[in-house]
Structure formats: C-alpha cells, structure tokens
C-alpha cells in the first residue's frame, strides 16, 4: 500500500469512528439509555470501512439493471462519504425511491438490521440501492463504514423496546456474531460450515 494513502485512510477511519460514536450516543439517548450504551457495544467490534468500485457498464447491460439491488445493511449504522457519482437511492415509507443528492460536505447515515433487531423496530433498517448511471462509461467509487457491535453482543429485542412497539417481539434472539454469519451465508459470502 502507498504509505501516503494509508496515512490518509487511517485518519479518515478514525474520524469516522469518532463520528459514529457521537451518532450512537445520540441514538442511545433517544432510546432512554446512557449515552455510551450503543457505543460500548461496538468496542472491539467488526467495524469495517470498504472502498467499493462500480466499474463502467458493459454495452450489453440490460435496461433497468442496477449496480446494487435493494437491500439493508447488516450492522448497527453505516456512514457513507459522498460517492464519486450519483446512484444511491433510499426507499421511502410508501415504497417509492428517493434519489440521494451527494454533497462532499455531508456524511450519509443509514440504520441497519442489527439496530432494528435490538430495538424491536424502533430504528428501522434503511432500504437502499445503487442505480445505474445515464452514461454507461461512468464509474463510481463509494466508501462506506459499516459500524458493527462485538460478536458477543446479545441482539435480542430489549423488553422495554418490545413494550414500546406493541408488546410482541418481532425479531430473533441472537448474538451479533451469529447474526453476521447468518446474513453472510444468506448473501453467499460465507458457508454454513464456517
């Protein structure tokens, strides 16, 4: 790795990690917990920052194809610096798609499935996708930070959140590590034997 690149990426990672703790602190307060509640769960967690390259499209790319189909992220929250090209869309409550306007001054934040599970749906996972550009020659780089809790964290919906969401647990009792593995198997990035 180019030393200058590593220095810049390390600094960006630490700044985004610091921001994630502030956001998780706000979420914790909103939930009526102490400010460190969610942040402490991510200490020594599986948080990862990826650089994703969406190459230019081939001439045979079918009409209506997307770069990344509709999905929700597995983790607690995702922080996303503005990508090099448009394409990100989020699903509204009515099922319609809203284009996310990129702006280098802002960080986009998505809530993920693990936070939804833990809060029994008080925090909903953000359904999103990446659509193809109008120009097939356009490439796109994206750099999400997926903020994960430690594997041992129990994601069973907490009783206080169950009572706030109708009194019935809507999500499974599972640890973060098992949840991550289950989802990686579902998307073909792990096997059930791992």
What are these regions (language model features)?
Residues 6-194:
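C-terminal flanking tails of non-heme Fe-dependent oxygenases
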């Amino acid at each position: 790795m180019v030393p200058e690149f590593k220095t810049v990426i390390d600094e960006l990672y630490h700044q985004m990690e610091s921001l994630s703790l502030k956001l998780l602190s706000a979420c914790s307060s909103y939930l009526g917990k102490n400010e460190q509640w969610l942040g402490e769960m991510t200490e020594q967690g599986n948080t990862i920052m990826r650089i994703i390259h969406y190459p230019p499209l081939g001439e045979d790319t079918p009409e209506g194809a997307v770069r990344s189909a509709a999905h929700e992220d597995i983790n607690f929250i995702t922080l996303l610096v503005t990508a090099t090209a448009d394409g990100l869309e989020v699903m509204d409550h009515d099922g319609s798609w809203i284009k996310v306007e990129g702006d280098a001054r802002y960080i986009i934040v998505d809530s993920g499935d693990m936070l939804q599970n833990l809060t029994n749906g008080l925090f909903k996972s953000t359904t999103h996708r990446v659509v193809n550009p109008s120009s097939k020659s356009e490439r796109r780089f994206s750099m999400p930070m997926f903020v994960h809790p430690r594997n041992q964290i129990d994601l069973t919906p907490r009783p206080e959140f169950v009572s706030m969401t109708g009194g019935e647990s809507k999500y499974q009792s599972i640890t973060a590590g098992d949840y991550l593995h289950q989802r990686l198997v579902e998307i073909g990035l792990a096997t059930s034997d791992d």
